[in-house]
Amino acid sequence: MPSPLGLPDFIALAGGRDWLQARGAAGIQPLLAEADCSVLAVLHPGQALSSATIARRVGWSPAALEPVLSRLESAGAVDKTPGGAHRVNPALVPRGSVFALEAKVKDWQKAVLQGRAYRSWADNYVVLLGEVGQVAVRRAAERVSHDGAGLYSSSGWVVRPRARRPAPAKRLWGFEHLYAATACSVPAL
């Protein structure tokens, strides 16, 4: 799956099957621009916000925000109330956890570096190791544990990933890339 940063070997969506189905049923094209996700991430489905509040929360000028809001409204991602406030389409609120999996036969250090980059948008990463020695497994486990990430070797789980969340806008950006990948192919669920 092409992601916001890098190309993980595998992606796992845990507990988000209903989100993926609702996202597809919404009929909204994937929103892959980081700016779009920055705006959407400050919106809520149940609470409409004024343009001024959105601009302040995103850190943009109202002039920079208006074309993005207009585009998102045209796409069906944002609803505008009769009073001029905005709320996000509920189908765009991520549910579940996305894990980026990086498989390496030997170079666990490269897998950890790649996994750390994926954590900018994924809930966490897991390194999948092939047949390596005990010293390599121990060193990889130390690095991965420090990150709160996961390590899986040929003998099973060495370190299980801990729950974490990236910044809301980056997380939404990752979920939108996941949706784009599944909209173009049939994922293994």
Question: Which functions belong to the PLM regions below?
Answer:
Residues 2-4, 16-38, 55, 86-89, ...:
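Non-catalytic C-terminal interaction segments of nucleic acid-processing enzymes
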Residues 9-22, 96-105:
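Conserved catalytic cores of phosphodiester-cleaving nucleases, focusing on short active-site segments
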Residues 23-41, 50, 102-154:
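Catalytic cores of nucleic-acid endonucleases
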Residues 40-42, 47, 71, 93:
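N-terminal targeting/trafficking signals and adjacent low-complexity tails
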Residues 43, 54, 67-78:
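Basic amphipathic alpha-helical segments that dock to polyanions
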Residues 45-58:
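Short acidic, hydrophobic short linear motifs in intrinsically disordered regions
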Residues 59-67:
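Short, basic interhelical loop/turn and adjoining N-cap
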Residues 77-88:
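Charged low-complexity interaction tracts in eukaryotic proteins
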